[in-house]
A protein has these predicted regions:
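Charged, amphipathic alpha-helical segments and their flanking helix caps
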Residues: 1-33, 45-144
Length: 144
């Protein structure tokens, strides 16, 4: 079990979403959004759950965020809402189907997806944010 394996597996699952297909998947919060949709994920927090005599088990909170460049036409906005919904369902299905993330964690679960808007470089983007909680047992070895 490893955090790097967790992150690699999340990347693989996000890249394999086909409805909608991301133009790019970014590990880390994107600085510049050139493609739509862009799927990104990053570590939000890391904490110790419990400790034994030989190791520590941890919880990792990952933020998954999808970005769509917003268009002005009403028909495009209506189609976008369906694409946003499909992205939420597809991402949650991919991650739930592999709750152990390829054997790299003990358990994982998606939280409630939120939608909203952000502006970057004068361009408005529709966003979906999905919190993702991961438990990694025996992640840190304690040596006496």
């Amino acid at each position: 079990m490893s955090t790097s394996g967790v992150l690699d597996t999340i990347n693989t699952h996000l890249a394999s979403v086909t409805n909608p297909t991301p133009q790019v998947v970014v590990r880390g919060e994107p600085i510049l959004l050139n493609a739509s949709p862009t799927f990104a994920y990053w570590i939000q927090s890391h904490s110790e759950d419990f400790e034994t005599l030989g190791d520590r088990s941890t919880s990792l909170s990952v933020t998954i965020r999808c970005y769509w460049r917003l268009e002005q036409a009403q028909q495009v906005k209506e189609a976008l809402e369906l694409e946003v919904y499909n992205a939420i369902v597809s991402i949650k299905q991919k991650l739930s189907a592999d709750a152990l993330l390829g054997g790299n964690c003990q358990y994982s679960i998606c939280g409630t997806a939120d939608t909203g808007y952000i502006e970057q470089s004068g361009i408005t983007f529709k966003i979906v944010t999905i919190p993702f909680q991961i438990d990694v047992y025996s992640e840190e070895t304690i040596t006496p």
